[in-house]
Design a protein with these regions (language model features):
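Ribonuclease/tRNase effector modules and their secretory precursors
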Residues: 1-75
Length: 75
């Protein structure tokens, strides 16, 4: 699986949450709980994934771009 993000979202997320996307995506190395965020029409399917990184609970919001790419939106 390939993970991508925009530089703007990366910097904003690092400033607000103090965790880099490279670290946050490690939740996918173990079990996750996921649900579709259907609160709004985003024009794409957004998924909340919750998992652990070094014992810390992390939530990652992503969208599937194709069969092998997840676009990280937020952590």
């Amino acid at each position: 699986m390939r993970y991508t993000w925009t530089d703007e979202k990366y910097r904003d997320n690092l400033r607000r949450h103090h965790i880099a996307f490279e670290d946050a995506i490690r939740i996918f190395e173990g079990p996750t709980v996921e649900r579709v965020d259907d609160r709004f029409d985003y024009g794409e399917v957004r998924v909340y994934a919750i998992g652990l990184v070094n014992g810390l609970e992390i939530t990652v919001i992503y969208t599937e771009r194709d069969d092998d790419e997840r676009r990280i939106i937020s952590e």
